[in-house]
Amino acid sequence: MGPGGTCPWSSRLSGFRVRTWIEPVVASTQVAGSLYDAGLLLVVKESFKSEAGGSSNYSANQSLVEYQEDQQQKAISNFNIIYNLVLGLTPLLSAYGLGWLSDRYHRKISICTAMLGFLLSRIGLLLKVMLDWPVEVMYGAAALNGLCGSFSAYWSGVMALGSLGCSEGRRSVRLILIDLVLGLAGFSGSMASGHLFKQIVGHSAQGLLLTACSVGCAAFALFYSLFVLKVPESKPNKVHPTVDTVSGMMGTYRTLDPDQQDKQNVPRNPRTPGKGKSSQREVVALLFVGAIIYDLAAVGTVDVMALFVLKEPLHWNQVQLGYGMASGYIIFITSFLGVLVFSRCFRDTTMIIIGMLSFGSGALLLAFVKETYMFYIARAIMLFALIPITTIRSAMSKLIKDSSYGKIFVILQLCLTLTGVVTSTIYNKIYQLTLDKFIGTCFVLSSFLSFLAIVPIGVVAYKQVPRSQQGECAEKQRS
């Protein structure tokens, strides 16, 4: 294989080729992000600790500690509602424009701008800890992060750079490697976060070391992308007339066209153009519905889970919280490893359903968790929970024209973003209302939504069956 068909790491490691690797940026950014997520939750928890003090009129029949804990949980939940609204809506103003500028002028624009927002938000948390600012200052930090594009602009830029300089045959390996780096970096940062969140001798602020490390990693990522990272030259793709594959975040997937038959074994019959386009539009619409319903379940569970583990019966400390967040990154790794295995023998729809069943079953068990080991069993059942959204996005790319990629994916991303904002608000309110009754209500709801999302995907799977097989099944049922 000549140099034109290889990825940067498979040929001679020249200085320029090493500088085209996006992995150092992904790793440092994700470590900073995992430290920030844990630090923000713990700092907010400590900030509301004093405000959740008991009342002199409060009944002595109930424990004062439980009352303070409930008030603290509600305060954190209300903070999360506003914070997620700001962080979720502000990128809508800039993410699309940054993507357009990156395509037109320079590929690093969206990455560098988004990482500037990451750095500013991390600095905001550091200043809040050092100067004991009110916790509301983090709303401004979230707004700055969002106006710089946030994760939407950043990850689209990472995927673009990861795909450049690599032939289509090796592109899936490159993108999987980026996913692996992301998962391992997040796991490492989360594992360390609880240990870093402690008082420094001579300083009363908790979380100073944790937030300082987050700022340092974010600053390294920004300066590396500005002064070291180079945009690789694009490699020409080889045309494979009998193979219809598209690279996604988790590898290369097979076609999902319901009207496409085996090109090698089945002779092509003329089809009515309008019928084929109509069928594809129906499949894309069903995939949209499945993605949105599943995203409702996933986003709601993640938002509530952080509060759930801080309250009885688990009542985790800082170190345990870091370990619990790290388990989420293990799920990220197992999900794309699952895609690597499943894509060899299953259709896209089958992989999506496997992921939805995995998440729904784990969420249902999570609702009845009483001990820490039960929490990790539930998370282990969710090991394929990240497969559905990525596979849906990859499957949709096979059903639309290249010229429509941007429009369709922007619409999908906007739908998922708005869904996440609405879901966060609704789930946090439900959590507050059911805090004293059944704390696992949100997880039961997520499980139901996850199983409900299988319905539109099942319809897509039915449409995927060749017409000849559907006719044979109908004849067998008549006989």
UniProtKB/Swiss-Prot annotation:
Keyword set includes Hydrolase: no
Organism superkingdom: Eukaryota
Disruption phenotype: Mutant mice are resistant to psoriatic inflammation.
Transmembrane spans: 24-44, 81-101, 111-131, 141-161, 175-195, 208-228, 282-302, 322-342, 349-369, 372-392, 408-428, 442-462
Tissues with expression: Expressed on cortical epithelial cells in the thymus. Mainly expressed in the thymic cortex and is highly enriched in SCID thymus. Also expressed in lymph nodes, heart, fetal liver, brain, spleen, intestine and kidney, but not in adult liver, skin, skeletal muscle and lung. Expressed in skin epidermis.
Post-translational modification: Glycosylated.
Purpose: Proton-coupled transporter that delivers pathogen-associated or danger-associated molecular patterns to cytosolic pattern recognition receptors as part of the innate immune response to microbes or tissue injury. Has selectivity toward muropeptides that contain the amino acid diaminopimelic acid (DAP-type peptidoglycan muropeptides) including Tri-DAP and tracheal toxin (TCT), common in Gram-negative bacteria and Gram-positive bacilli.
Similarity comment: family membership: Belongs to the major facilitator superfamily. SLC46A family.
Name used for this protein in its record: Solute carrier family 46 member 2
Record organism: Mus musculus
